[in-house]
Amino acid sequence: MFTPYGMSTLVKLAAVSVGTLLFSILLPLQAAIPVGSAAAIFLIFSLWFFRDPNRSLPPGKGIVIAPADGTVMSIKACSHPFTGNGSSIISIFMSPLNVHVNRIPVTGTVTLLQHHPGSFSMAFDEKSGEENERMEIGIESNGMKLHFTQVAGFLARRIVCPLSLNEPVTAGKRFGMIKFGSRVDIVIPAGWLPEVKRGAKTRAGETIIARLATTAGNG
């Protein structure tokens, strides 16, 4: 299936690809082959990029699920205004080949939602989390506060986030996407331990990226 968050873009890209394919028929064979091939490859990439596969939420309590497909870039200790001292930030880089639909990491209520305009530096640049265009999201769940940020990158210049303040959300629920490569930063509070390491691959809605310290080692 394809994500509704990118359907308008997908339709436009598909129209351009199909139009180019039809135009290539009118060209001499020597030119038609490369033009038609390029259009076909572009169409296949567009369909692949906006795919939205189903995911199976892992069982268990006291867990945080990856909000994005990608590769863990870094895990660092931090102090954050939403989650407090003793927090940890996990950064996930999403390449253009990853599924770009984002999913809610914990069940709870959205209590923070703030969009920041900014630049479009490479997503793997550490400064991009503070300087690039981004959407901050905070969820409160049974006294626990979790913060995560959709960060636009050099290619990803469109953040989609239809969430609303005070909206109840469920772990694994689709909540938006970042188009064409980007990153997601997740801040977990003190008392929660990262379950992934740098370089690990994540799948949104399936990979456990953090666990409550009292349950660590039980999953």
Curated annotation (Swiss-Prot):
Cofactor note: Binds 1 pyruvoyl group covalently per subunit.
EC number: 4.1.1.65
Pathway assignment: Phospholipid metabolism; phosphatidylethanolamine biosynthesis; phosphatidylethanolamine from CDP-diacylglycerol: step 2/2
Post-translational modification Pyruvic acid (Ser), affected residues: S182
Record: active site: S182
GO molecular function: phosphatidylserine decarboxylase activity
Membrane topology note: Peripheral membrane protein
Annotated site residue numbers, Cleavage (non-hydrolytic): G181, S182
Reaction catalyzed: a 1,2-diacyl-sn-glycero-3-phospho-L-serine + H(+) = a 1,2-diacyl-sn-glycero-3-phosphoethanolamine + CO2
Domain of life, source organism: Bacteria
Localization per Swiss-Prot or TrEMBL: Cell membrane
InterPro entries associated with the record: PS_Dcarbxylase, PSD-A
Keyword terms: Cell membrane, Decarboxylase, Lipid biosynthesis, Lipid metabolism, Lyase, Membrane, Phospholipid biosynthesis, Phospholipid metabolism, Pyruvate, Zymogen
GO cellular component, one term: plasma membrane
Cell membrane in keyword set: yes
Post-translational events: Is synthesized initially as an inactive proenzyme. Formation of the active enzyme involves a self-maturation process in which the active site pyruvoyl group is generated from an internal serine residue via an autocatalytic post-translational modification. Two non-identical subunits are generated from the proenzyme in this reaction, and the pyruvate is formed at the N-terminus of the alpha chain, which is derived from the carboxyl end of the proenzyme.
Family indicated by similarity: Belongs to the phosphatidylserine decarboxylase family. PSD-A subfamily.
Cited HAMAP family: PS_decarb_PSD_A
Protein task: Catalyzes the formation of phosphatidylethanolamine (PtdEtn) from phosphatidylserine (PtdSer).
Protein name from the UniProt record: Phosphatidylserine decarboxylase proenzyme
Species assigned in the record: Chlorobium phaeovibrioides (strain DSM 265 / 1930) (Prosthecochloris vibrioformis (strain DSM 265))
